[in-house]
């Protein structure tokens, strides 16, 4: 469960490594949630590939690593991208793990480009509030429900746009690798 990953991220990244509540700690926690999904779909993609692909490449004189890089990975890219899309979709809506690791807001200054400043938008060590945390906070605190609904709609649109973009990229890579 993501709440357990959030507590794990808090203990490891904030307490043990001393990162503090930051974008980096949140990204590392969400990446822990993404690893099983991406690993499982990648393993399924490799196991679903016909064995003669690799054998044919080796038979033509390619080394094992050349076969993996030039045959196996390109043939598996569409299914691997599916895992990335699923993991990213989960990461977009993640609130529990981020609650413990990113903080709950920051005062950004869009004209401040000093990377060490906590108000710089590009500083990965600054606290941050994600859209999913904002939705959670608005619902829990009973503030403006219309703002919470608008934030949820924006989050769904962002996930949809990411999925469309990732699918287009996957189709492009597949078309490029198939020779059409």
Regions found by a protein language model. Name each.
Residues 24, 31, 35, 53, ...:
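Alpha-helical membrane-protein architecture signal
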Residues 12-13, 27-38, 88-92, 102-107, ...:
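Hydrophobic transmembrane alpha-helices
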Residues 1-30:
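Generic hydrophobic transmembrane alpha-helix motif, especially the helices
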Residues 170-180:
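Short cytosolic juxtamembrane segments of multi-pass membrane proteins
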Residues 1, 60-61, 74:
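Glycine/proline-centered hinge or cleavage motifs at structural transition points of membrane proteins
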Residues 99-156:
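Interhelical loop and adjacent transmembrane-helix boundary motif
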Residues 25, 32-53, 81, 85, ...:
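Membrane-embedded alpha-helices of multi-pass transport/permease systems
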Residues 41-42, 64-102:
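Transmembrane alpha-helices
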């Amino acid at each position: 469960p993501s709440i357990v990953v959030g507590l794990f991220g808090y203990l490891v990244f904030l307490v043990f490594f001393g990162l503090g509540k930051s974008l980096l700690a949140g990204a590392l926690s969400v990446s822990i949630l993404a690893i099983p999904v991406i690993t499982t779909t990648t393993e399924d993609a490799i196991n679903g590939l016909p064995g003669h692909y690799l054998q044919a490449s080796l038979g033509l004189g390619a080394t094992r690593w050349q076969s993996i890089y030039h045959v196996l990975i390109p043939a598996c890219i569409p299914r691997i991208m599916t895992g990335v899309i699923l993991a990213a979709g989960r990461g977009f809506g993640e609130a529990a793990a981020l609650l413990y690791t990113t903080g709950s807001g920051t005062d950004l200054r869009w004209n401040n480009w000093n990377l060490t400043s906590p108000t710089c938008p590009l500083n990965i060590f600054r606290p941050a509030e994600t859209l999913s945390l904002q939705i959670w906070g608005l619902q829990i605190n009973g503030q403006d429900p219309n703002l919470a609904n608008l934030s949820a709609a924006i989050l769904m649109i962002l996930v949809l746009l990411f999925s469309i973009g990732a699918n287009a990229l996957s189709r492009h890579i597949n078309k490029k690798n198939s020779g059409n």
